[in-house]
Curated annotation (Swiss-Prot):
It comes from the Viruses. It is found in: Host membrane. Keywords: Host membrane, Membrane, Transmembrane, Transmembrane helix. One of its GO terms (cellular component) is host cell membrane. It is a multi-pass membrane protein. It comes from Sulfolobus islandicus filamentous virus (isolate Iceland/Hveragerdi) (SIFV). This is Putative transmembrane protein 10. Its main location: host cell. The chain crosses the membrane at residues 3-23, 27-47, 85-105.
């Protein structure tokens, strides 16, 4: 496990723990306790957990794209799963407020959660409804 994967896994667990301890207390008045934390979670996970099927194909010779693909491939399934679990825990506790962002994220991450249906996607096994 490289340094980034190690850090992201620990950071993900810390985010989940902070959500669990937050309970019904709000971080900002008028928001669910996990919104602010999981907004950051969504952003971070979108940087490395999503691997579009066309971006990493051999036809793309851009060094930047290749670097991005290597960056994605270096991430561990554990850290991706923990990030996803954190998002799911927020969704269940903040259904109405988090409804739209959750499904936007879910759509953008289609190949992560449904890796068997699209080529070139990161193989991740998550229990998803």
């Amino acid at each position: 496990m490289n340094n980034f994967s190690y850090f992201s896994t620990i950071f993900s667990i810390a985010l989940m723990s902070s959500n669990a301890f937050a309970g019904n207390d709000t971080l900002l008045v008028g928001f669910c306790p996990c919104i602010e934390i999981n907004t950051l979670t969504l952003f971070l996970s979108s940087l490395y957990a999503i691997k579009p099927s066309d971006s990493c194909s051999p036809s793309y010779t851009s060094n930047l794209l290749n670097l991005f693909c290597d960056f994605v491939n270096s991430s561990t399934h554990l850290s991706i799963s923990v990030f996803s679990s954190s998002v799911l825990s927020c969704f269940t506790s903040c259904f109405v407020i988090y409804f739209y962002p959750f499904f936007v994220f879910d759509s953008a991450s289609y190949c992560v959660f449904n890796s068997s249906s699209r080529e070139g996607c990161t193989s991740v096994t998550i229990g998803w409804g």
